Swiss-Prot record:
This is Heat-inducible transcription repressor HrcA. It comes from Thermomicrobium roseum (strain ATCC 27502 / DSM 5159 / P-2). HAMAP family: HrcA. Transmembrane segments: none annotated. Keywords: Repressor, Stress response, Transcription, Transcription regulation. It holds the Pfam family HrcA.
Length: 348
């Protein structure tokens, strides 16, 4: 339904939404005139609020004389009325500093990103690992532990590090293992699981075993990426008034633990879009209707995409949450780019 609001109605809606997001209370016409410095009478504002209510932008709680925004009103505000915001320079510097202080590995970055999103927005911070259309090998090492037992350490194009043990058909010294990895790395660099499995066919036993384990590790990583989610900041959300109802807090826990975001929602999103704000019924699943989700994609090389965002009640500071999500996505993308250093696979 396309509705043309007057400029005054737009301003009234904007002030009602922002006051409600700030206080959590219904907003009356008299208070709105005073706080928003509107140059009209409370009666005129009441009339416009009645029109906005009839158009489903505002609702009239039974326990209050004021109005609150509906889901439709919140969505209109975010799309048409909300002013773009940015994190302050001080916040941006502090966040970048935090990322330089942690271990320079993907899991540490993603856990920190979820934590920073939670602290900055006051909601649950969510981050998924980068998911490759096809995961590729970047580098691997073989480390001798005892006689025939070797530690295989590999790094993928998306920056994931994986370790596994393998038992060789015959013992090799560390010098021999290093020579083997130095010989194979240039041949295998940027190959996917299927290509490495083909290389294993007809290879001598030790090489075939190493190649098969590399292929298995890539398969494991691809599967793990589809089910992993970093979530931080639940304590921020459950302190909010909306979660005074125990069932809503329980529902949020079920959403996070049950994998609904990963298995149903994320595959339906377009990573080329910048920042998505999904409110209530936008999330389609009944379990997610009480919430809002703000998220965007970050990049790790040409073929890998991860998601990060915030999840919370529909009454949230949308402008600040969008600013936090946008900035964290740029920071994580920069870090992934530095780590990956891989070729542009799109270009061949």
């Amino acid at each position: 339904m396309s509705v043309q609001l007057t400029e005054r109605q737009r301003q009234i809606l904007r002030h009602v939404v922002e006051e409600y997001l700030r206080s959590g209370r219904a907003v009356g016409s008299k208070a709105l005139v005073e706080r928003a410095s509107l140059s009209v009478s409370p009666a005129t504002v009441r009339n416009d609020m009645s029109v906005l209510e009839a158009l489903d932008f505002l609702a009239h709680p039974h326990t209050s004389a004021g109005r609150v925004p509906t889901e439709h009103g919140l969505r209109y505000y975010v799309q048409h009325l909300m002013e773009e915001s940015q994190l302050s320079s001080e916040e941006q510097l502090m966040i970048r500093h935090q990322f330089r202080q942690v271990e320079q590995q993907v899991p540490s970055w993603l856990k920190l990103a979820a934590s920073v999103l939670a602290e900055t927005s006051g909601n649950v911070g969510l981050v998924t690992p980068p998911r490759a259309r096809v995961e590729r090998l970047r580098h691997f090492e073989l480390i001798s532990l005892r006689r025939r037992v070797v530690l295989l350490v590999l790094v993928t194009q998306s920056g994931t590090i994986h370790q596994s043990l393998l038992e060789l058909p015959q013992p090799l010294e560390q010098e021999e293992l290093s020579a083997l990895s130095q010989r194979l790395n240039p041949e295998l660099r940027w190959l996917d699981r299927a290509a490495i499995e083909r290389r294993a066919q007809g290879a001598e036993p030790t090489v075939a075993l190493v190649l098969q384990r590399l292929a298995e590790a890539l398969h494991f990583i691809e599967h793990q990426q589809r089910s992993e989610l970093y979530a931080e900041g639940l304590e921020h959300v459950i302190r909010q008034p909306e979660f005074a109802q125990a069932n809503l807090a329980h529902l949020l826990l079920e959403v996070l633990r049950g994998g609904m975001l990963l298995t149903w929602l994320l595959p339906r999103l377009d990573p080329s879009e910048e920042v998505r704000v999904l409110i209530g019924s936008d999330l389609a699943l009944r379990e997610l209707r009480p919430f809002s989700l703000i998220l965007t994609a970050y990049r790790s090389g040409a073929e890998s995409t991860g998601w990060l965002g915030v999840l919370g009640p529909q009454r949230m500071a949308y402008a600040r949450a969008v600013a936090a999500v946008r900035f964290l996505a740029s920071v994580v993308s920069e870090l992934m780019s530095e780590l990956s250093g891989g070729p542009d696979r799109e270009g061949g």
